[in-house]
Amino acid sequence: MQGLAVSCQLPPAAAAARWRPRASSSNREAVLQCWKYELSQDHYLGGPLRIGQSQGSLHRHRSTNFLRPAAAAISVEQDEVNTYLPKGDMWSVHKFGGTCMGTPKRIQCVANIVLGDSSERKLIIVSAMSKVTDMMYNLVQKAQSRDDSYAIALAEVFEKHMTAAKDLLDGEDLARFLSQLHSDVSNLRAMLRAIYIAGHATESFSDFVVGHGELWSAQMLSYAIKKSGAPCSWMDTREVLVVTPSGCNQVDPDYLECEKRLQKWFSRQPAEIIVATGFIASTAGNIPTTLKRDGSDFSAAIVGSLVRARQVTIWTDVDGVFSADPRKVSEAVILSTLSYQEAWEMSYFGANVLHPRTIIPVMKDNIPIVIRNMFNLSAPGTMICKQPANENGDLDACVKSFATVDNLALVNVEGTGMAGVPGTASAIFSAVKDVGANVIMISQASSEHSVCFAVPEKEVAVVSAELHDRFREALAAGRLSKVEVINGCSILAAVGLRMASTPGVSAILFDALAKANINVRAIAQGCSEYNITVVLKQQDCVRALRAAHSRFFLSKTTLAVGIIGPGLIGGALLNQLKNQTAVLKENMNIDLRVIGITGSSTMLLSDTGIDLTQWKQLLQKEAEPADIGSFVHHLSDNHVFPNKVLVDCTADTSVASHYYDWLKKGIHVITPNKKANSGPLDQYLKLRTMQRASYTHYFYEATVGAGLPIISTLRGLLETGDKILRIEGIFSGTLSYIFNNFEGTRAFSDVVAEAREAGYTEPDPRDDLSGTDVARKVVVLARESGLRLELSDIPVKSLVPETLASCSSADEFMQKLPSFDEDWARQRSDAEAAGEVLRYVGALDAVNRSGQVELRRYRRDHPFAQLSGSDNIIAFTTSRYKEQPLIVRGPGAGAEVTAGGVFCDILRLASYLGAPS
């Protein structure tokens, strides 16, 4: 028998349709009496079962893995004697939810998974087909509301299962299932009609109606398994699972009674594969009921405990348990293992893992639960067990996951009269209990001056009213100063078994929240230290979750990068990042994510990282109008990544003027742009002060010498106690190229034109020939050496003839430049006659605190005369390198080498943040 029998004859549908109850209690009672049904215990157990216990207990027989009663301990009267329920590792328990059972194709996939399990015995718990439970509840609700459409809704339920069965089954199995389906639906139609007439249904009656979804899905799966030739039985768990109400809409299993009934059931149907209904059970009085929320998972855990299964596998549509809600944190990862306590804490604080009560039955027998994805069998899933493996190393593994609870209110009870007064906390929470509110978290100051607790926002009004009423006298007398309610709160919980043994976890968590500008309203931590719970504004919750998760789960050297100026240097940098990012992540655990690229007119933004293999195409197709404020806000407001850096690849003064504000926001800055370090001295000093105060990094190696280690060499000398006497060098790659190639065979103007065509000069060569760029580099080095010089303090001898400085365009300048070729030829000839060459240099005299930029002559054996191409050369004369200067030489111009210098600064930043050297 598949359904539960009603003990009295229900009125035929036609007769019931003609009859309408009067609004009288006697009529209502008459109809309610009609619903009463009684289940025979004989139906469940095949005969009365009596159990008497003296002093023994149940023991597992070691050799056979059967459950055997201790001698004279238990006597069981049943029809079959000497029939024992096998227990232990031979059993594997699987649970498939409604999504897994949603279609005939999926039910067949479930059957294939079951058949692929090599366990000796398998017990399969199934939910109703997807959305059927809601449909069944809706049937009862419609009937209670006297909505005639309940009949149409019932027909839809019937059609759904009939269609599924026809797609899945055939032959005699299909006929049997459809016959039972017709019978059950006919009974349901009569029962719903009775509800319609009375306008009311008891909870047990509703549970009986709703439970049919599980009955039908279990039968369909058992028939599908039988098609393969495997022996299979199906179990109505109302015959086995006995529960008692425990308050708060919960039930507790009666394990002893469940064990007796399961043993009796198995004596009649000892199949190797058992398909059982989830969610439904019965009371001790054999009244149908349900296991409430997440009941099917609970069913699997109870049955797994009863048979001492090897493991319980919960099949879902996700790959396992995430370290955080992946809908809120895109970087959430699948956890391979969790402890029972961690899973319980996560479930309590809202993580979609398991209901906390699901863990209790298996926890006492150390039975692991595995969460797996039916739609991705290659994913190993998450194992919940007693002793989980470490995930990511020491500190990273101490926090396993983060969970949040929204829509809460914080209630704060405060007053000097609370301190040292016994019973105050008891009175507070007694009042909360009396109104039936659920306390999520409690925090009390050690001074006993205040206590606060979080409750669901929908319950806070009655809680507040009850507290004001209960403590009216104390409030009036001033013993309590206030009962305050703060709405719009959320809880963020960090969960981890190893938090108790790992120093510094709280510091890391609160540092992450502080850097995300999150204000914490309350804190709680149990003495077990399995979790740290903080209460914060609900509007800050997602930002807090991302910030905390990134600190513990992303690499310490995960950098969110924003690139300003995707031109020659910026474009070269992006291509270098594209080619090297994967290598850095694999070899050095440096994770670079470019989440923004902006030019002067358009910008491209991403929350998690731009695909650098097609950044140019994306910048054209998906870009939005450029706005430097919005661009920086996008970077600073992204709390997925713990560290942010802005890379300015422009030569723009207005962009450089923002460095101070970016550093103040906690954003690191890297740039080859000289404008900030050679600009007004007061602004430069303000910038450096902010950089130190904000604990951010400001790197600018490529401002002098492109990719050459000029700044770092100078810093190394100064930091080790050396004293700078003089710095002299050829700082311009453009001018180095021009004078290295001006050897007398070609006119000066021709060499300049060649350099312009090769891309060595600025669009207007006067910007290079003026010497201002070299002067800026001298100022950068002077300030790095501790000299407070302005750009105006550096005399510059420009190479631009005075009469050509006013040319309206670069083309006009290039047309008129040949008129000065004779002058340049004469200077070159004079130098050559003296065995010298012309070189344009910048010089810093640290002793006299002065600098200059000019054209000089050097002997052919001088290092400055040995250059080729666009090489730079810088000579450091110091107290240690006084007789023979320290020389740094190499290519000093070009997008690739400059971008390489910027890239080195990015890696230097990663090293400062914790990357291995």
Curated annotation (Swiss-Prot):
It catalyses: L-homoserine + NADP(+) = L-aspartate 4-semialdehyde + NADPH + H(+); L-homoserine + NAD(+) = L-aspartate 4-semialdehyde + NADH + H(+); L-aspartate + ATP = 4-phospho-L-aspartate + ADP. Residues 413-488, 494-571 form the ACT domain. GO terms for biological process: aspartate family amino acid biosynthetic process; homoserine biosynthetic process; lysine biosynthetic process via diaminopimelate; methionine biosynthetic process; threonine biosynthetic process. InterPro entries: AceGlu_kinase-like_sf, ACT-like_dom_sf, ACT_Aspartokinase, ACT_dom, AK-HSDH_N, Asp/Glu/Uridylate_kinase, Asp/hSer_DH_NAD-bd, Asp_kinase. The active site is at K777. In the N-terminal section; belongs to the aspartokinase family. In the C-terminal section; belongs to the homoserine dehydrogenase family. This is Bifunctional aspartokinase/homoserine dehydrogenase 2, chloroplastic. It comes from Zea mays (Maize). The lineage of its organism: Eukaryota, Viridiplantae, Streptophyta, Embryophyta, Tracheophyta.
